[in-house]
Amino acid sequence: MWYLISASELEQYLDEKREIFLVDMRDRESFRSGHIRGAVNMPEEELWERTKELPMSRLIVLYCYHGPRSMLAARQLARMGYQVADVYGGIQAYRGKYLTEKNCR
């Protein structure tokens, strides 16, 4: 199963310290320039080779730049049996306190 969450819902999950596995699907350079604290960088081209790193027992929360790539990945991961949420609007929509740098937009 997969579903969309808003950037503010992600902020709430982080505030509540929910057991999520946060995945940043952007390229490494973008990740290094700034990301949401706690995220693991798995660029789109690596994600499918690294699915064994994704815990089946936790909600996988994906984000990319604007949302479409992570939404497609969320659908595919759900077909593989993962519980997945996709951040609507990607990192562009996130304005919360968990950004490691302000220049990641």
Task: Show which residues each predicted segment covers.
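Rhodanese-like catalytic fold shared by cysteine-dependent sulfurtransferases
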Residues: M1-F21, D27-L59, P68-R105
